[in-house]
Amino acid sequence: MDSRMEIDFMDLNSKPKLSEMEKQHKKVSGMKWPFSLADLATHHEHTFFQNYKSTPIVSINSKNSSLNNYKSTIDPQYFRGTFPLLAKTSTYDSRKNYDNLSPNESTLTIFYMGEVHIFPGISPEKAELIIDLVSKSTTLHMDEILEKVMNKEKYEENKSDPSNASTNYAKGALAMARRATLARFLEKRKHRLIKARPYLYGENLSKFPFDIQQQEEETASSSVHWEN
């Protein structure tokens, strides 16, 4: 008796319970399903894909009044700020001339100062002639242009660089200083010779002023030794 009570207390003698979904299904239907839930799912998927292949998911028909009414209520100005493809751009206008050109028509394209210039109806021969004319016109006046540029550069260098004028002034001042020092040296030498002459030759002072110029060359060497 005690052993049975313990088994029942541990819930070991009870039968396995059905799931809640099966209980509710039995209560509602009151009958058994002829196939399982997995078969039901596969059958539903098969019918869904058949319907998908036969008819499109969304079909826009102009005869459908509900879609037309919804389309009429949409304002295209509302989407221009968000969708740039709906807004009118200048690229379409700029490509009109290019689209109008025939595929066999040759064009001349010139890139100058960050701009593109297209000239239609110009063959390669005409383009070569234009290039030759431009090259010849530049070579004819190239020498004159170079001379003007060189003269202008020289003038600007002399004008902007004050070092040239300062160097010329410094050279002139140095030459003048050298001449002044040489003149002072010669003058002092002359005075020394005048003072030393009567003592060297024993001549009188009265005769000295008259014959000093005649005997200057003779006394020059002796005065040099005396200075040393």
UniProtKB/Swiss-Prot annotation:
Cellular compartment(s): Nucleus
Description of what induces expression: Induced by infection with the bacterial pathogen Pseudomonas syringae pv tomato DC3000.
Span(s) of short sequence motif Jas: 176-199
Motif, Nuclear localization signal: chain positions: 177-184
Coiled-coil intervals, chain numbering: none
Alphabetized UniProt keyword annotations: Jasmonic acid signaling pathway, Nucleus, Repressor, Transcription, Transcription regulation
Biological process according to GO: regulation of defense response; regulation of jasmonic acid mediated signaling pathway; response to wounding
Domain Tify: 101-136
GO CC terms in record: nucleus
Family named by the database record: Belongs to the TIFY/JAZ family.
Subunit structure: Interacts with MYC2 (via N-terminus). JAZ7 competes with MED25 for binding to MYC2. Interacts with MTB1 (via N-terminus).
Task of the protein: Repressor of jasmonate responses.
Descriptive protein name: Protein JAZ7
Organism: Solanum lycopersicum (Tomato)
Gene symbol of the encoding locus: JAZ7
